[in-house]
UniProtKB/Swiss-Prot annotation:
The gene is bai. Its main location: membrane. It holds the Pfam family EMP24_GP25L. Eca and bai are essential, though not redundant, for dorsoventral patterning of the embryo. Specifically required during early embryogenesis for the activity of maternal tkv, while the zygotic tkv is not affected. It is found in: Membrane. Disulfide bonds: none annotated. GO terms for cellular component: cytoplasm; membrane. This is Transmembrane emp24 domain-containing protein bai. Belongs to the EMP24/GP25L family. Residues 21-172 are lumenal.
Length: 206
């Protein structure tokens, strides 16, 4: 019973960390998948595309600054991996290329990605450390739990940063509004005094 509950928890944690998608890629188009990844995390992926004679699909993985982390041309089926240097939004793009003389056909692309602790080989760790299967499962669950906690801490930190930014922006907007109102009141007062002196000079008012 306890082992069954442990397996359920492991499956839920794996669903949290692993991402499998399948999509259709139209001829001469590209589709990108983007995700925020913490610093110093290993990202691994497997891809497979439906084969259409004469059509080519390339893939490229890069960060928001355009640095290429992984790239391959004319792909059909394979794997890739890269290490995230800093916390950033990383994207993986699949690019379809079809010759001008050929009528393009929509291709299917499947992608499975893993990051962080999901990239570890716990079977190898268990054999090296001579751990029992249940101990390996517990080790996997512990690492996954730590990873989820770190993700929540990072989300909380980013939320606080965004809240601080919003508060600073609101304070600046309020200060600018008060400053604008003071300028308008000052300008209106100056206009009244100027017109009063003008009308007095023209002897239109006492």
């Amino acid at each position: 019973m306890a082992r069954a509950a442990l397996i359920v928890c492991l499956l839920m944690a794996c669903a949290w960390s692993s991402h499998a998608v399948m999509f259709k890629l139209s001829p001469n188009t590209q589709k990108c998948l983007k995700e925020d990844i913490q610093a110093n995390q290993l990202v691994m992926g497997e891809y497979e595309v439906s084969d259409v004679p004469g059509q080519i699909i390339d893939y490229i993985a890069r960060d928001t600054k355009g640095h290429i982390l992984s790239q391959k041309e004319h792909i059909t089926k394979g794997k890739f991996s890269f290490m995230s240097e800093v916390y950033d939004a990383y994207e993986i793009c699949f690019i379809s290329k079809v010759p001008a003389h050929q009528r393009g056909i929509v291709q299917e692309v499947s992608l499975l990605t893993k990051k962080g602790v999901e990239t570890k080989s716990y079977e190898g760790i268990g054999e090296a450390s001579k751990l029992k299967p249940l101990e390996v499962d517990l080790k996997r669950l512990e690492d996954l739990s730590d990873s989820i906690v770190r993700d929540f801490v990072l989300m909380r930190k980013r939320e606080e940063e965004m809240r601080d930014t919003n508060e600073k922006t609101n304070s600046r907007v309020l200060f600018f509004s008060i400053f604008s109102m003071c300028c308008l009141l000052g300008l209106a007062t100056w206009q009244v005094l100027y017109l009063r002196r003008y009308f007095k000079a023209k002897k239109l008012i006492e």
